[in-house]
Amino acid sequence: MGTTKVTAPLIFAISVATIGSFQFGYNTGVINAPEAIIKDFLNYTLEERSEPPPSSVLLTSLWSLSVAIFSVGGMIGSFSVGLFVNRFGRGNSMLIVNLLAIAGGCLMGFCKIAESVEMLILGRLIIGLFCGLCTGFVPMYIGEISPTALRGAFGTLNQLGIVIGILVAQIFGLKVILGTEDLWPLLLGFTILPAIIQCAALPFCPESPRFLLINRKEEEKAKEILQRLWGTEDVAQDIQEMKDESMRMSQEKQVTVLELFRAPNYRQPIIISIMLQLSQQLSGINAVFYYSTGIFKDAGVQEPVYATIGAGVVNTIFTVVSVFLVERAGRRTLHLIGLGGMAFCSILMTISLLLKDNYSWMSFICIGAILVFVAFFEIGPGPIPWFIVAELFGQGPRPAAMAVAGCSNWTSNFLVGLLFPSAAFYLGAYVFIVFTVFLVIFWVFTFFKVPETRGRTFEEITRAFEGQTQTGTRGEKGPIMEMNSIQPTKDTNA
């Protein structure tokens, strides 16, 4: 249980799984660069079909639909996670849904040749469905195959895959690469290649040992996989912990989404999970990238698109930093630091945006605030909400919890994308004050309600929530408060 050995089979399995995270990031960012070119495609295609030419309102609506339909697919996919992982397992589920990525990529890649707006929109919907499923599968699989002492560091690799995907999409979208009138279908269809690579590699990755033992009762196979992944023969304590959880599961009824909100021992962790997902999407990170190009242009940057890519590089670098910090500082501490730093930068951005017309040097202050804001995001609110959900729940409720948390993330992402342009139009630079208020609310919630899970087994975390529920009915202070410490469980194998 206390192993910190990093083995080749473990790294291989996690790397293959994070291809799904890369796909999510890539398909999130890929639509932005060729916006003008795709609008021209929509206009040309509709003109060929009918007279009179399409109105600007229709074109804007179709473009908005092409962008937003991705999030709609993500909502549906994220809420369907449990349907796959409980029936097929974690690894097989990732393998099966790559068919969606290939189908969606083909539709988008061939939409120009077919002169079909419908193929583009349907392809975005299907790829959104795929990415929504991946946002549940990947953190769950990584969390279940990782040693307790390294679970947070490996869990952060999910976010690293996402930001690398966004960065690659930004780079490929440059006019000198694939962001041209002729090559943009290849830019969208590129998602087929990672899907094929993952399909080829997944058969060589083991199934989650927790799924095999707890769900399938295949103890020997689970033990063999743990020994191979962790590079140690001494996995008896971990196997016993899984067997104890399996026994508890057999005495409980199957956990549904409604049960998560009804049962006292699940209610607090699911509320924490939802709030952490909201803290990611309502932090203002999308607003920062929305404003960044204009700010870089005002500061005299000749090619603001390259500066935006630079912000993406900062995004990636600080996600790597988070990988090394999360097991040292703890999830809760990093999330608090991230939220606090972002709140300060939001205020600084508001002030500098309001004054940059009067003081030209304020544009450089604003650029600095943007880069630091992005860095703080990747230290806490970026990576932590994805993998901490898997830590807060046992094997039984975990799929349903991942579905609810993922759906709340996708839904809030969709709403921010829908409402932010109007908010920015009416509020201008003051829009960041709204995000500052959200960040302060989430900081307070995290400080008082979010436990530290570093170094604790799934069973220990679950028992702590159950203990709080039981003692809470007697008006006593529950043991979950002890988890707000950043001290990990002592290594009993030492």
Swiss-Prot record:
> Region Important for selectivity against fructose: what ranges?
277-279
Phosphoserine: which positions carry it? S485
The protein's matches in CDD domains, at most eight in alphabetical order, are given as:
MFS_GLUT_Class1
Spell out the Polar residues composition-biased ranges. Answer: 484-494
Q: Which residues bind D-glucose?
A: Q159, Q280, Q281, N286, N315, E378, W386
Q: Where is this region: Disordered?
A: 469-494
A Pfam family annotated for this chain is Sugar_tr
Q: Answer whether the UniProt record assigns the keyword Transport to this protein.
A: yes
Q: What protein family does this chain belong to?
A: Belongs to the major facilitator superfamily. Sugar transporter (TC 2.A.1.1) family. Glucose transporter subfamily.
> Can you state the subunit structure given in the record?
Interacts with SMIM43; the interaction may promote SLC2A1-mediated glucose transport to meet the energy needs of mesendoderm differentiation.
The protein, known as: Solute carrier family 2, facilitated glucose transporter member 3
Species the sequence originates in:
Bos taurus (Bovine)
Which gene codes for it? Answer: SLC2A3
